[in-house]
Regions:
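Sec-dependent signal peptide recognition
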Residues: 1-7
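Short segments within alpha-helical structural elements
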Residues: 183, 212-240, 370, 382-443
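Membrane-embedded beta-strand positions in outer-membrane beta-barrel channels/transporters
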Residues: 56, 114-118, 162, 262, ...
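Outer-membrane beta-barrel architecture
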Residues: 81, 118-120, 285, 324, ...
Length: 447
């Protein structure tokens, strides 16, 4: 017995000497406290479009991914509650029946009824229960931030799809006008060819132009169908749901995001906070695994009774006490490997956090660049549209006084329509990139 105690003591001390080969740290979630910096998570309302606001509210109620994230949060809270219950004693009851006889004597069966209540409590001498509870609490935080991230991503996707729908519908009208003008040009070319004033190659070219315009219109209508499907999936509605788009794209105002927000504002991103929460959960998981290098001590007390009569077995006249000591470190190899596995889980979580932070920085950098480029392109498209509008006005006057042919007039009108489509697309790209900046930063920040 003395030798066994010595062996256990040696293994225990050896377990205490086992440490992670990596420095395990507990990370904290950055709380931004800057009186000169305010965040706005309802940035989409700045577009002043009631239809957009209504669709976002509907999506927040119906979206399947958001519901799933909400259920995951509820589940993690329940799991945390179960683990927190380990701080309290555990009450249990038991009831049993036993019948036996001595077959060598042929006695009758001796019946015994046993009933009892027991109360047990594990002493958290080495912090295993506390660490497990902390891990569960951080898992709840992770689920909260994951829900927030799903919500942010949903809003951004819906805003982008909504503006795309308006752009496509506006562009569809221009494409239809373009097709009508191209067909008018085709009739003019055919008439000229019939009177010998045009070559057959001109007929082939205009026919090819008509086909290309038809193809562009069909492709645009396919984009409308695809985007409508995306919108309905985000909203969680069926095909019979009537999508409403109140404004034309040129009526929607820009929100002018601030491109000089301090770097530390990235700590507001929900996915970054989720990664930190997961990192902390893995840290405490490691502490739980490391606690197995120490003994586990439980105290117990109980009331019980045994009687030959069932009705007399509930007296609970027998009081008992117990002390239970578990030595998980005796299975040293498995305990050590579990600790090493928890160490690797922590390192994976740390790597995921560092990668997420780097991805976030690159996403913001890209979003700023795309926004600035789209803003410049929008200004160029507006200037080009203004010049083509003046040229078309000149063509109208020239055609009115017979200084130009119908073909040149229609060509000028077609160029104007193409410029209007280009300007619409540039406006959509700018609006989309504005929303992407707010998604990349986790909110709209204003100094």
């Amino acid at each position: 017995m003395r030798n066994l105690v010595m062996i256990c003591a040696i293994l225990w001390l050896g377990g205490c000497g086992v440490k992670s080969s990596n420095e395990i740290k507990n990370y904290k979630i950055l709380q931004i406290k800057d009186e000169n910096l305010t965040s706005d998570t309802f940035w989409y309302q700045r577009f002043n479009d009631p239809n957009l606001d209504a669709l976002i509210n509907l999506a927040l109620k119906n979206n399947a991914d958001l519901k799933k994230a909400g259920l995951n949060l509820k589940k993690s809270m329940i799991n945390a509650g179960l683990i927190e219950a380990d701080f309290a004693p555990t009450l249990s009851a038991n009831s049993s029946f036993n019948a036996s006889r001595d077959i060598s004597k042929g006695d009758e069966f001796a019946k015994k009824y046993q009933n009892g209540l027991t109360l047990s409590y594990e002493l958290d001498l080495f912090g295993k229960i506390r660490a497990n509870n902390q891990s569960a609490s951080w898992s709840v935080k992770y689920s909260e931030f994951d829900l927030e991230n799903v919500k942010i991503t949903l809003i951004n996707s819906l805003v982008s799809a909504y503006f795309n729908a308006i752009y496509l519908q506006n562009a569809n009208k221009f494409y239809e006008q373009n097709l009508a003008i191209t067909r008018d040009l085709e009739r003019i070319v055919r008439t000229k060819f019939a009177f010998g004033k045009s070559e057959y190659a001109d007929v082939l070219r205009i026919e090819q132009n008509v086909l290309e315009t038809q193809k562009s219109l069909v492709n645009l209508q396919s984009q409308i169908a695809t985007n409508d499907e995306l919108l309905r999936n985000l909203l969680g509605v069926a095909p019979d749901f009537n999508l409403k788009f109140g404004k034309n794209l040129d009526e929607i105002s820009h929100t002018h995001p601030d491109l000089n927000v301090p770097f530390y504002a990235l700590g507001n991103r929900a996915d970054i906070k989720a990664m930190i929460a997961n990192l902390n959960a893995k840290f405490f998981d490691y502490k739980v695994a490391f606690a197995d290098f120490f003994p586990s001590i439980s105290l117990g007390a109980g009331l019980s009774d045994i009687d030959a009569k069932f009705s007399q077995s509930y007296g609970l006249n027998l009081f008992s006490q117990s002390v239970s000591i578990k030595l998980p470190f005796l299975d040293f190899a498995r305990v050590k490997m579990r600790a090493q596995s928890a160490d690797i889980d922590f390192l994976n979580a740390l790597n995921s956090y560092q990668n997420a932070l780097n991805v976030a920085k690159n996403e913001v950098h890209k979003s700023y660049a795309l926004y600035q480029n789209s803003l410049e392109n929008e200004q160029i498209s507006k200037a080009n549209l203004a010049k083509l509008s003046k040229l078309f006005e000149i063509s109208v006057v020239q055609y009115k006084y017979g200084k130009t042919e119908l073909k040149e007039y229609l060509s000028a009108q077609k160029d104007l329509i193409n410029a209007q489509i280009s300007a619409l697309n540039a406006k959509y790209e700018t609006l989309k990139n504005e929303a992407q900046i707010y998604k990349a930063m986790g909110a709209r920040f204003v100094k």
